[in-house]
């Protein structure tokens, strides 16, 4: 029974991830005044499945100088972590109801750094290694602000549980009292998932393709799947943290509908940003975080700690 529960969670996520690639290509196409994929199936709707078949049927290339075990483990670990992040997410009922759900998501997302670093090192190519080092520095840096923003938000809800966050937002979205945090959080999620304008790891002009330059066929597809799964997850998390979906104990479908709509809109904004903005320079990327976001988030964190103390208030805690 538990295995069926896991499948009913993972299969829709993988299907959503497949269609997100199609939506991205369609949006980029229409924003560049062209059609995008429209050959495979009606309106190109079967394109993701054709891509998956092509990638997994190709022979996986392995350069002679690579470290074989790490070369294969890295993409597998990447996708495994991306899928395991969904475990504590309420939809409206999580797979495992963790009291420290938010901490689990933070800790597991930090582990994805290892898969990037291993893939860059195991490829035994200087371009891969440079791409991996950039990705690791960027991911670790932006995780600092994400953790502080989450801490500030959790001070308002009073619990690390994601269910509690939704209960807190029954009357008002946390987006309204904490909108500067929400803006910084959204930009940090863009950087965390290595998306434009922060896709420095894939700088085509200088790094060919980044840490996955030596990968082809199946292992490359695993990295690709992990990236898009993470995009959906980050937007789902943004939806829960700042735009608490409607929750009524007797109407679970109401929650699912509002949750899906918010996640879809946020994901579309990700793609819209990709089509609109040029890439940042690497030093600007780091300045934005360490000189702008970090002092601001620390100041907000102090504010959210001191406010309930001054007003002798306590957060809603169950």
From Swiss-Prot:
This protein's superkingdom?
Answer: Eukaryota
UniProt subcellular location:
Mitochondrion inner membrane
From the record, give the transmembrane residue ranges: 3-23, 70-90, 100-120, 146-166, 171-191, 231-251, 254-273, 294-314
The alphabetized UniProt keywords are:
Electron transport, Membrane, Mitochondrion, Mitochondrion inner membrane, NAD, Respiratory chain, Translocase, Transmembrane, Transmembrane helix, Transport, Ubiquinone
User: InterPro entries, alphabetically?
Assistant: NADH_UbQ_OxRdtase_su1/FPO, NADH_UbQ_OxRdtase_su1_CS
Q: How does it sit in the membrane?
A: Multi-pass membrane protein
GO CC annotation terms, alphabetical: dendrite; mitochondrial inner membrane; mitochondrial membrane; neuronal cell body; respiratory chain complex I
According to its UniProt record, which reaction does this protein catalyse?
a ubiquinone + NADH + 5 H(+)(in) = a ubiquinol + NAD(+) + 4 H(+)(out)
Q: What is its EC number?
A: 7.1.1.2
Its BP terms in the Gene Ontology are: aerobic respiration; mitochondrial electron transport, NADH to ubiquinone; mitochondrial respiratory chain complex I assembly; response to hydroperoxide; response to hypoxia; response to xenobiotic stimulus
MF terms (GO), sorted A to Z: NADH dehydrogenase (ubiquinone) activity
Q: How does it assemble?
A: Core subunit of respiratory chain NADH dehydrogenase (Complex I) which is composed of 45 different subunits.
Function as written in the Swiss-Prot or TrEMBL entry: Core subunit of the mitochondrial membrane respiratory chain NADH dehydrogenase (Complex I) which catalyzes electron transfer from NADH through the respiratory chain, using ubiquinone as an electron acceptor. Essential for the catalytic activity and assembly of complex I.
Name the protein family.
Belongs to the complex I subunit 1 family.
Q: What is this protein's record name? A: NADH-ubiquinone oxidoreductase chain 1
Q: State the organism of origin.
A: Rattus norvegicus
What are the leading ranks of the lineage? Eukaryota, Metazoa, Chordata, Craniata, Vertebrata
